[in-house]
Amino acid sequence: MTLTAFVDDLARSLGFLSRLPIASRFFQNHSGEMSRTPRAFPLAGAVITAPAGLLLALMLGLGASSMVAAFAAIGLQVLLTGALHEDGFADTADGLGGANRERALDIMKDSRVGTFGVLALVFGVGLRVAALASLVNSLSPINVALVMIGIAAVSRALMVWHWHALPPAKPDGVAASLGKPEDNTLYTALFLGLAVAVVTIAPVTSFHPLAVMLVASGAAAFASNRLVSHRLGGQTGDTIGATQQICEITALASIAMAL
């Protein structure tokens, strides 16, 4: 793995996961195939979330309430990602409400958001905001920002696991057209997710909250893998995004409870 190749993958990951402007040269002569690129997802997640963490710290420093600052931070995250993961979360929630596999996949292709999708977004955003506001009571503003960055890396690593662990549910779907992460891609993503979490979270909390967060988010990803495999027979672009959201929500809630 050369540094230049990894920087290219990081830039492509940022372009794939966010609305950040990325130079077109990183996509020239690239087929769009994603067997290697997701290894940089954890670092991309950290970069994407850093502005939201800094906004949270700034607003708290200027006297904003924890709830207002948390809402603003989550709102900026959504803007920076173009609600990519939230869209997948809502579509997956709607789809899993379907009576069978075929109906579920049809529902997930529908651009309209149903009742389950709306409820998933309400509860998902609400839990993230509440957990962030709770963290403010235990940590300094800048330390909460660091926790956000670490969790962003972990949740992106676990979405790579979901992508790698399951076959495509639809042979003509977006996930199938992009290819599947290689074994080394998964191992690198998991290592980077863990490394970023250790560097950002361990120094500002302790080993116990970090361990609780890692175990809880890993268990959430495992449960997501099993549920999606059972109901849909494989992953889609929507379930990959949903797994990221499930893991982020679980990570924020678990570390807030552990502190």
Curated annotation (Swiss-Prot):
Primary localization class, coarse: membrane
GO molecular function: adenosylcobinamide-GDP ribazoletransferase activity; cobalamin 5'-phosphate synthase activity
Catalytic activity field: alpha-ribazole + adenosylcob(III)inamide-GDP = adenosylcob(III)alamin + GMP + H(+); alpha-ribazole 5'-phosphate + adenosylcob(III)inamide-GDP = adenosylcob(III)alamin 5'-phosphate + GMP + H(+)
UniProt EC number: 2.7.8.26
Membrane-topology descriptor: Multi-pass membrane protein
One GO BP annotation of this record: cobalamin biosynthetic process
KW Transmembrane helix (keyword) present: yes
Disulphide-bridged cysteine pairs: none
Membrane-spanning intervals of the chain: 43-63, 64-84, 116-136, 141-161, 185-205
Cofactor annotation: Mg(2+)
Alphabetical keyword list: Cell inner membrane, Cell membrane, Cobalamin biosynthesis, Magnesium, Membrane, Transferase, Transmembrane, Transmembrane helix
Annotated pathway: Cofactor biosynthesis; adenosylcobalamin biosynthesis; adenosylcobalamin from cob(II)yrinate a,c-diamide: step 7/7
Pfam family name, one: CobS
UniProt KW Magnesium keyword: yes
Localization terms from the record: Cell inner membrane
InterPro entries given in the database record: CobS
Gene Ontology CC entries for this record: plasma membrane
Function: Joins adenosylcobinamide-GDP and alpha-ribazole to generate adenosylcobalamin (Ado-cobalamin). Also synthesizes adenosylcobalamin 5'-phosphate from adenosylcobinamide-GDP and alpha-ribazole 5'-phosphate.
Family: Belongs to the CobS family.
Protein name: Adenosylcobinamide-GDP ribazoletransferase
Gene (name only): cobS
